[in-house]
Amino acid sequence: MTAQEIIKELPKGLIKWYEFKKGTRALYIMGHGNLEQSLKESLMECGLYVECAAMDEVDGWAADEMEGRTVDGFYDRTLSGYEYILMSSAVEQAEPEAGLIKLLKKVRTLLKADGKLFLVTENRMAVRYFCGDKDPFTGRNFDGIENYKRVSAFDKKRLAGRLYSKAELTGILEQAGFPYHRFYSVFPDITSPQILFAEDYTPDEELDIRIFPQYHSPDTVFLEEENLYTSMIQNGLFHKMANGFLIECSLEAICSNASQITVSTERGKENALCTIIVRDGMVIKKPLYAEGRRKLGKLWENNCYLQRHGVRMIEGSLVDGTFVMPFVDGMSMVKHFRQLMAENKNEFLRQFDCLWNLILHSSEHVAYDAVDWDHFNPRWDEEKNELKQKKIDRSRWKKVAFGSDEDREALGAVLERGYIDLVLLNGFVVNGEYVFFDQELYVENLPAKAIMLRNIDLLYHGDTRMEVILPRKELLERYKLDSCIEIYYAHIGHFLNKLRNDDILYSYHLAHRRNHEIVHSNRQRMNYSAQEYQRLFVDIFKNLDNKKLYLFGSGNFARKFLALYRDEYEIAGVIDNNETKWGTAIEGIEIAAPSVLEGLDAGTYKVIICIKNYVGAFRQVRDLGAINIGIYDPNTEYPRRQGKVFNGPLSGTQVKKKYHIGYA
């Protein structure tokens, strides 16, 4: 599938999981959004007879037209008795707020007595907007959160729509005559749903490693929303701050019994599945497309294979085109190992060793002489550059495999079936045993250590406490992953790219997912007044004439600074707190202790800090007497020295402020 074809399929995960009555009538009330075509197709693919009407059409239908008569101009359709009605952008684009209530009252008369209305909408109180995303209608930060109070009456009339909160939507529905409704909180976005949670269900898993946030304006984001999910859950804010909603409305007290729905439409039609946790204690997995029906048979076969190899799996059975499993009330393996590391490091290591042993025995091992070493790195065959392709040493890993005992131990076992998803994210701890699920795929001839590396990465992802308790490097050394880590990441990256179509969707993700360095830059601006920020981060070369320049830091930031500016500014020295670097050099410049600043005349030098976490360094050099301090941001373009690039005088400001926060 092409990128555009996949992107068109992404929103379908919102409703394709639902058990619609096939052969019944559905009405799609359309606004002017980008979901319309995809959601209309979803209803048709679910076996419904779908009719469409524009929002203003429905609003203009007279009462007698809704008594069952056929009306000219509407394709001879009968304007009553719909089993299902769906509205998406029409919710946000109807005249606020009375206009939406009026529209919903009219929609109510079109439903059968046991019919269902579905609303799809964003949430003005979404966590994404607290993290710096722009409102989709005003194009500015925080307008929805403030309920559009800073938007003038004139501008409000020109807006294409507005967002509502969960409380507002609840009130609107009840005023419109829909007393029964169930909200499903959608993450990360209604245009690209990954997971939906019913409002009466509290998730009990590490969502920070499952959800990939996305935004209307990723360049203005200053906070990583996934770090807030756990606190939102603990404080009863999770559903109130969901990024979007699917709302199921009924005239009777009957709604779906689904509690959580996970969808994977980004994987393409053959691999897209949904997993539904239902209230009766069961979990149902089913394909989202007819092309994926064979996946369930493979899932069942993989379960049997792994159980034969000593891996305990959640028991499941194939029932009417679905894979049905019991709901397991156990602690997620991510939470288990994170807690265990914090409480008892020795016991953590013992149990992590058990996990490694389980991975090693999850499949037969392939003899080294049976491995196709010329294609062992899956990235080799993806290289499009002909010159680079010729430079690939295809015998590299064969030399390791048939080298010394130490080399072979470093590379490790190659599994006949490498279940690369045999990871903490897909497992529970039940009565002291590890129980796994969702083993849909395996990779042939996979290094076992690639699976272990994924587990370590998931354990440390987004939780800085883990690094303090037990540095990640120690686990890499314990399982001898460091010397051949390149080949493990090659297999992991290849697998994930193919599974999630990351390469195909690269431009889409670039437009909607945040850049961590930009987030860092945006956030640091918020700690200073405009004048302070200008002095510290923008005018870092100001008043440098006749002063010695020292760099604080000798890592990647310093290397980039030197590559760009050392020919224009004389660097007197580099200082660093790392004692092991004192007396060594970076790009020919000696690295010294920060104490070299003591005793210097503060007016004769300037320090430019070249490290990411600059706060401590800033305080340190200030305490050492420095008064001229700048902080280098590698994401910022600074003016070149006069005569090097510009013909005119410098203004003392940046050439271009690439990223911004606040109103556009």
How would you name each of these model-derived features?
Residues 2-24, 533-538:
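Conserved alpha-helix/loop element of class I SAM-dependent methyltransferases that forms part
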Residues 508-664:
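Hydrophobic, well-ordered beta-alpha structural blocks that scaffold small-molecule cofactor pockets
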Residues 138, 143, 397-468:
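Catalytic activation segment of kinase domains across protein kinase-like and atypical kinase folds
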Residues 99-116:
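A short glycine-rich, Lys/Arg-flanked "PGG" loop and its adjoining helix->strand segment in the class I
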Residues 260-305, 326, 333-337:
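ATP-binding glycine-rich loop module of kinase domains
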Residues 314-402:
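Conserved structural core of kinase catalytic domains
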Residues 157-183:
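Short alpha-helix
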Residues 119-143:
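Conserved class I S-adenosyl-L-methionine
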